């Protein structure tokens, strides 16, 4: 069962989308995130605040990646001045893309 982590982050400087995309690429390359996660999305809330949604393959994968994630979060806080405002997480019980695949495989009507 997929596991979802949703967080909000505050930056000292206005968000620079290109810089953040470069940082995300660095995280992917450094920590081999594909081993544990399905998707990570960062989105802008306001000029200084962004949200993140991370979808892990399972709760076990979330816990396996947790130490690496802590290292990158510490770096983000110390070097990029990005601090965690709040976080929520839990198992996903309904995922639209999974339902579409399941219905297609079963030849069920889509409406």
Where are these regions (language model features)?
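Conserved short loop/helix modules at catalytic or binding sites
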Residues: 77-82
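Short S/T/G/P-rich N-terminal loop/turn motif that feeds into the first structured element of a domain
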Residues: 1-50, 57-71, 83-111
